[in-house]
UniProtKB/Swiss-Prot annotation:
The keyword Ribosomal protein applies. One of its GO terms (cellular component) is cytosolic small ribosomal subunit. It comes from the Bacteria. It comes from Aeromonas hydrophila subsp. hydrophila (strain ATCC 7966 / DSM 30187 / BCRC 13018 / CCUG 14551 / JCM 1027 / KCTC 2358 / NCIMB 9240 / NCTC 8049). Keywords: Ribonucleoprotein, Ribosomal protein. PROSITE patterns: RIBOSOMAL_S9. GO terms for molecular function: RNA binding; structural constituent of ribosome. This is Small ribosomal subunit protein uS9. Belongs to the universal ribosomal protein uS9 family. The keyword Ribosomal protein applies. Gene3D superfamilies: 3.30.230.10. GO terms for biological process: translation.
Length: 130
């Protein structure tokens, strides 16, 4: 591992992201592809950049990310969580700012399981009084 490389693991829904940060020019590589190639949706790209824009380090750090599991939204959230954790390892003084923005807290919401006798997690069969 490089001497000044920082690491953070992020999770959201069923996605897991491993984020490596080092000083550089602002290059973001996700699963050997650029941010623009990996995420087609502008909202997902925005979510990924949020912690960097908050601490104004968009052009100062290079990010190497591997992410797997889940869909686009979950992966973007996992990457954001991972970047936040790596930034805190890089500079602990950023923690309060990132916490205020709500990036430090792991979003614990997951898909609710389907129950027996119901169509979905909460959708019940139609009720007939007579």
């Amino acid at each position: 591992m490089a001497e000044n490389q920082y690491y953070g693991t992020g999770r959201r829904k069923s996605s897991t992201a491993r984020v490596f940060i080092k000083a550089g020019s602002g290059k973001i590589v996700i699963n050997q592809r650029s941010l623009e190639q990996y995420f087609g949706r502008p909202t997902a790209r925005m979510v990924v950049r949020q912690p960097l824009e908050l601490v104004e380090m968009t052009e100062k750090l290079d990010l190497y990310i591997t992410v797997n599991g889940g869909g686009i939204s979950g992966q973007a959230g996992a990457i954001r969580h991972g970047i936040t954790r790596a930034l805190m390892q890089y500079d602990e003084t950023l923690r309060s700012e990132l916490r205020k923005a709500g990036f430090v807290t792991r979003d614990a919401r997951k898909v609710e399981r389907k129950k027996v006798g119901l169509h979905k997690a909460r959708k019940r069969p139609q009720y007939s009084k007579r």
